[in-house]
Every structure is written in structure tokens, then in C-alpha cells.
Amino acid sequence: MEGILNNGKKIIGVVSAKGGVGKTTTVINIGAAAANMFKKSVLILDTNLNSGNLGLNLGLTYHPISLYNIMKDPLSILHSVHKHKTGLHVIPSSLVPDTRKINPVLLKKKLKSLSNYDLILLDSAPGVGEDAKISLRAADTLFLIVTPDFPTIGTAIKTIELAKKMKVPVEGVIINKVRHKRYEVTRKEIERVLGLPIISMVPDDQAIYEAAAARMPAVLYRPKAKASISYKKLSAHIFGKRVQSGSFFNNFINAFRI
């Protein structure tokens, strides 16, 4: 299997046209799967500078040095990395008054210099504004997150058009919160409207909400859940691998039980 990360690519921007579709959840889970299933060194960054909650979703409630600090001051980007118990390296965001102070070209240069990471995931701000453009400019390729409803699919077209304008490839679409109801937009219709391949369909799974409450990735908290399996397969796809059956995740989660 050929993976996504080739020809020097290692920075994936996870983007969407609107909030609440599951970008942060996707970043955390495919990152955690890569770090633990495939023993990859993974860095996840919150580039949603005005309302990011990547750190909060992992229980990082206090982070004096954030992405904004390293872009504003001449600090090494590694100074802001939080080493999480899941094996993920995390750079959270903080509220800033003016996103124009962030130089996405400089950010990409800094990220490219981190040769010790196999995969870098950017949790983007939603929409097509200046804050959302940070991830697009810094990424090598993009994952577009949608939910199977017409308003979300319609607005996703704007994100695709922006990516084309900025000459950033969109690897494919992740359909999140799938319930397989008659009122949902079908996979075939989403592919037709957006003109992009569907690389994953993630079910609307109770395990995601339980894991979020525990401040843990679902792939570790509930490894056998349907959504967790979808995220593990997506992570495997990134590296051109297959998900192997076994007890690794079952054993690993015991280390996090309270």
C-alpha cells in the first residue's frame, strides 16, 4: 500500500468549512493511533488561534507557552511542546487578539525543521478566514472534514476553492458523525458534489463522547468502538499500512484506567 506521506510530505492540515464537525477529535485520534499502533513520532498543533481547544481535549488546562508565543518570539518550537501520556507531542493554542501576527510561512519553515517527527497534524480554525489560512499555508496536504448534511457539504466547497487558490492539495474527505439515516447525504453524492475521494467514514459513536469526557483519544479509551476502528484505519492509510488484529490497544489502555 502506498501511504500519503511521500515526496517529503509530513504536515497534514485537518480543515473544515464550519465548526463542530470533529476536526479536533480527528487530529487527536489519528495522531494517537499513529503514535501507538505504528510507533511513529507525532506532533499535533492547534492552529485555531481564537477558539482552539486541542489542549483542553487532552486535559492540558495550563500551557504558558503556546503556538502564538513561538511565532511571536524567537523561541525554538520545541520549547512549546507538551509530552502527553498517550505518546503525543502537543502544541496548544491560546487566545490572541490578532491572528495577523502569525506568519504561516515561518510556521511551515519551523515545522519542516523538526526532522524527528514522522507526522505533524494541524488542527485548523474552521471557515475560510485569515485564521483558517494559517493551516492551509503551513500544510503539505489537507484532510477535509464534513458531516453528511447539505449545509456542511455546501460550505465545504468554499474550503476546496480556497485550497485550490492557495495551491494546497486536498488528499480527501473524511465524513464524520455518520448515522446511516435516510436524511443524510450519501457518500456517492458527497463525492460527486465535492469532486474528491472519500478516505474515511466515521460513525457517530457514543465512545467519542465518553473519551472526550475522560480527556483521552477514543482509540485508546475505547479501542474496539466503531469510530476508533475507523480512525485506526485512517491512520494506517496515512502510512500505507494495514490495521492488524491483536490485543495491543486492549493492553495499552490498561495503563490509563483510573
Question: Can you say where each PLM-predicted feature lies in the sequence?
Answer:
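Solvent-exposed alpha-helical segments within well-ordered globular domains of core cellular machineries
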Residues: 32, 68-69, 79, 105, ...
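Walker A/P-loop phosphate-binding motif and the immediately C-terminal alpha-helix
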Residues: 4-47
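Short, well-ordered alpha-helices that flank and scaffold nucleotide-derived cofactor binding pockets
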Residues: 28, 32-36, 137, 158-161, ...
